[in-house]
């Protein structure tokens, strides 16, 4: 397996797809990277030369914030919003959706499993 930005990328996949295994590199950035380095998107990772791997590694690490650095930056941004008490920070603290989605129904991913609440007692 080839290593780029501290990630083992799969040998059998096309390079354009394999690059998306790096956190912070999606399809668009993978395409931009390949265009800038002049490497074909259809090449399999196993067919890359060492020089091409070095060129890819240098380009990605030089131009993009990826993996640990990006994760740290995102976590720091969230921590800062929580500390200053912004609306987004409060939503993060409460574990609710941050970007204005409805919460009366749905939002189960952020809220977690349902906690059942006792219903009304029947009047006699």
UniProtKB/Swiss-Prot annotation:
Q: Which Gene3D superfamilies match?
A: 1.10.8.50, 30s ribosomal protein s13, domain 2
> What are its GO cellular component terms?
cytosol; small ribosomal subunit
Which example biological process does GO assign this protein? Answer: translation
The family database entries (HAMAP family) matched by this protein are listed as: Ribosomal_uS13
Q: Does the keyword Cell division apply?
A: no
Subunit annotation: Part of the 30S ribosomal subunit. Forms a loose heterodimer with protein S19. Forms two bridges to the 50S subunit in the 70S ribosome.
Job description of the protein = Located at the top of the head of the 30S subunit, it contacts several helices of the 16S rRNA. In the 70S ribosome it contacts the 23S rRNA (bridge B1a) and protein L5 of the 50S subunit (bridge B1b), connecting the 2 subunits; these bridges are implicated in subunit movement. Contacts the tRNAs in the A and P-sites.
The GO terms describing molecular function are: rRNA binding; structural constituent of ribosome; tRNA binding
Which UniProt keywords are listed?
Ribonucleoprotein, Ribosomal protein, RNA-binding, rRNA-binding, tRNA-binding
Region Disordered: list its residue ranges.
94-124
Q: What is this protein called?
A: Small ribosomal subunit protein uS13
The family classification in the record reads: Belongs to the universal ribosomal protein uS13 family.
């Amino acid at each position: 397996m080839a290593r780029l930005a501290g990630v083992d990328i799969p040998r059998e996949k096309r390079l354009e797809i394999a690059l998306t295994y790096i956190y912070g590199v999606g399809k668009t950035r993978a395409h931009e990277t390949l265009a800038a380095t002049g490497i074909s998107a259809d090449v399999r990772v196993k067919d890359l030369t060492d020089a091409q791997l070095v060129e890819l590694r240098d380009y990605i690490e030089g131009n993009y914030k990826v993996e640990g650095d990006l994760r740290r930056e995102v976590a720091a941004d969230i921590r800062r919003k929580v500390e200053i008490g912004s609306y987004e920070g409060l939503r993060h603290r409460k574990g609710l959706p941050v970007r204005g989605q409805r919460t009366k129904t749905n939002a189960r991913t952020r809220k977690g499993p349902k906690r059942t609440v006792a219903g009304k007692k029947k009047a006699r």
